């Protein structure tokens, strides 16, 4: 039973899908995907449940959601174990993901009150009221890299606002969503308020094109996001929020400070989660000169020592595998392409079996036209530069705009950088992958459609309703010209 529709666990009627552990290729989950008819049933169940769910006082919805948060906290190790088995991420890291799910719930509750409040005021004898109302049925598309945390960051704000949800997780991490949906069921969520449909492209297309949805919250690749954007472009009646990737630049100033700290910040930016975070550094701009040379030497030395292994290894790894063998091959092919274009490998990424890839660092300074691609893995491109102005210009030479960073102890350099860089998340002397849960998460360009998630998800899970009210109709002291009563 792999789908949760209208409160019932049911089998799919579509093609068989499997979740393969990327570190040993074992099948960890198997089921049949949802057909178009089953997707329509899930949307219909959500529509039916919406009528009663939106009527519930906010406090009643909050009680259930906080009960879910308590269950997530209680089952942290179980959730983390499943995520590790599906994604290959180290167990220590997946435990932090489960913890982040709990933290995001508290943030979302606060955001609901701060971003979508009820307000009243008097003006010229009228009562002016601002209310917020749920959109209706929200389709949520989840990614594989944070299969618990990222869908949670859309589902919870949607439910708090009074919406109902149909979740379509990544076909590479179905088990995680199944485990989490069972916690929602245990928390006492009414039937149909959340529905789970598993499947690959066909299931996703059926959900995205379903007439019964009022909005779609997407986290995933830019290619898929752009397809959805084109699909929804003629349908202004549906809300679309896209959270996509980035070709993220990290600029190392000549005044980068202590070498070891700078190296640590680069490692955390480029290779955490085996490079499978949308905010990971993809391009590293390093100043020409002795200090930059020495920094790169040390960076390569440290990157060589990164422990890469399966998530539960006795020698605790920093990095796990890529999500799949195909994803691992993509990184190795990208490296080969950059080498063919004139790039020089400072540390060559290598296959370590199954979906494992070791860290790669390639000097792409001599590549005439650096491909503007998101290499979603442990491959860092280095470009040497003369001036900060040149570095910022190069950093902005991308269609993306998710994250960017500057490593510098010079305040004036930071002021210049933050003024001229084009990105939604901009950090100084901190890893690019660091972001506050109560700050907007998103960026311009191909990284999204200006609907950032996290704290700001409340903005597009409810629409504002403005009212001008009086206890009874009134006749003004002076009628409008040309009117007689």
UniProtKB/Swiss-Prot annotation:
It comes from Aliivibrio salmonicida (strain LFI1238) (Vibrio salmonicida (strain LFI1238)). InterPro entries: Ald_DH/histidinol_DH, Ald_DH_C, Ald_DH_CS_CYS, Ald_DH_CS_GLU, Ald_DH_N, Aldehyde_DH_dom, SuccinylGlu_semiald_DH_AstD. NAD(+) binds at residues 220-225. Disulfide bonds: none annotated. This is N-succinylglutamate 5-semialdehyde dehydrogenase. GO terms for biological process: arginine catabolic process to glutamate; arginine catabolic process to succinate. The keyword Disulfide bond does not apply. It holds the Pfam family Aldedh. It catalyses: N-succinyl-L-glutamate 5-semialdehyde + NAD(+) + H2O = N-succinyl-L-glutamate + NADH + 2 H(+). Pathway: Amino-acid degradation; L-arginine degradation via AST pathway; L-glutamate and succinate from L-arginine: step 4/5. SUPFAM superfamilies: ALDH-like (SSF53720). Belongs to the aldehyde dehydrogenase family. AstD subfamily. The active site is at residues 243, 278.
């Amino acid at each position: 039973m792999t789908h949760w529709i209208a409160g019932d666990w049911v089998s799919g009627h579509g093609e068989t899908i499997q979740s393969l552990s990327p570190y040993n290729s074992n099948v960890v989950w198997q089921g049949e995907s949802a057909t178009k008819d089953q997707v329509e049933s899930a949307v219909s169940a959500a529509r039916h449940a919406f009528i009663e769910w939106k009527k519930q006082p906010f406090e009643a919805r909050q009680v259930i959601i906080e009960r879910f948060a308590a269950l997530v906290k209680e089952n942290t190790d179980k959730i983390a174990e499943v995520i590790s088995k599906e994604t290959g991420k180290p167990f220590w890291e997946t435990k932090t993901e489960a913890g982040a799910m709990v933290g995001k719930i508290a943030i979302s509750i606060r955001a609901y009150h701060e971003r979508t409040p009820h307000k009243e005021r008097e003006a010229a004898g009228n009562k002016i009221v601002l209310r917020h109302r749920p959109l209706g049925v929200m389709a949520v598309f989840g990614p594989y890299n944070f299969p618990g945390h990222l869908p949670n960051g859309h589902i919870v704000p949607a439910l708090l606002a009074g919406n109902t949800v149909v979740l379509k997780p990544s076909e590479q991490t179905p088990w995680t969503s199944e485990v989490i949906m069972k916690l929602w069921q245990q928390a006492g969520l009414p039937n149909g308020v959340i529905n789970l449909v598993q499947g690959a492209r066909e299931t996703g297309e059926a959900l995205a094109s379903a007439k019964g949805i009022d909005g779609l919250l997407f986290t995933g690749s830019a290619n898929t996001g752009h397809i959805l954007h084109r699909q929804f472009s003629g349908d202004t009646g549906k809300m679309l929020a896209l959270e996509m990737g980035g070709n993220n630049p990290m600029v190392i100033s000549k005044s980068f400070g202590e070498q070891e700290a700078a190296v640590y910040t680069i490692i955390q930016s480029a290779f955490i989660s085996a490079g499978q975070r949308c905010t990971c550094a993809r391009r590293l701009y390093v100043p020409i000169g002795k200090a930059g040379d020495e920094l790169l030497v040390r960076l390569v030395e440290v990157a060589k020592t990164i422990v890469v292994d399966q998530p539960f290894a006795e020698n605790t790894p920093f990095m796990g595998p890529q999500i799949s063998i195909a994803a691992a091959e993509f990184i190795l092919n990208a490296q080969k392409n950059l080498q063919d274009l004139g790039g020089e490998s400072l540390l060559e990424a290598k296959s370590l079996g199954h979906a494992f890839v070791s860290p790669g660092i390639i000097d792409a300074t001599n590549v005439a036209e650096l491909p503007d691609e998101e290499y979603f893995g442990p491959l860092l491109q280095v470009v040497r530069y003369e001036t900060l102005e040149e570095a910022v210009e190069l950093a902005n030479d991308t269609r993306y705009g998710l994250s960017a960073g500057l490593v510098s102890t010079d305040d004036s350099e930071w002021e210049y950088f933050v003024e001229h860089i084009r990105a939604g998340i901009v950090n100084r002397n901190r890893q690019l992958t660091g972001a506050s849960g109560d700050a907007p998460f998103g960026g311009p360009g191909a990284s999204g459609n200006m609907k950032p998630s996290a704290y700001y998800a409340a903005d597009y899970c409810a629409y504002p309703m403005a009212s001008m009210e009086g206890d009874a109709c009134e006749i003004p002291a002076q009628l409008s010209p040309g009117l007689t009563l």
